[in-house]
Amino acid sequence: VSRGLGDVYKRQVRNFTARGFLWYQGESNIFNYYCYAPMMTAMVQLWREVWEAPNMPFYYVQIAPHKYKDSQDTDAALLREAQIKALEIIPNSGMVSTADIGDEFCIHPPQKDVVGLRLATLALTKTYNICGLPSTGPTMTKVNYSEGKAIVTFDNASALSLIHI
């Protein structure tokens, strides 16, 4: 990311006050998923430098399921994986999922209020330390394979219900 770009941003935002960043982008990156995490990390570092806040919270939305034109079936999944990787390498960051509200034919989930509520809840718990709010959804932590079955372990899954098929 260009240092000059940071100087331009700094001049434009220096009189504003911010407590954190909310970010929803990535659909156009499904074809370059392999560099998404380092690019987003560099962007967050630049923004934090511009705001002179090296630990300012950065919360973002994982892309929703969608049938992307001209893409392999795995491209969007690989981008979602890259977004999880970014979560692991960007300090003081958080991610909300839209896996349950995606639309095959609409690139952005139609339920914007749900996305906003999830981001707000994440910020309230992580930035403002309000306890008792469900700020993250189920996160897969482990998979074991045994006798032709996959046993999947999740964190944050107390409200998760499963259907045996």
State each model region's role:
Residues 1-5, 9, 163-164:
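Single conserved hydrophobic/aromatic residue that forms the stacking wall/gate
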Residues 6-12, 41-46, 74-84:
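Alpha-helical scaffolding within the catalytic cores
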Residues 24-37, 69-72:
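The substrate-binding groove and active-site-proximal loops of carbohydrate-active enzymes
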Residues 125-162:
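Surface beta-strand/loop "capping" patches
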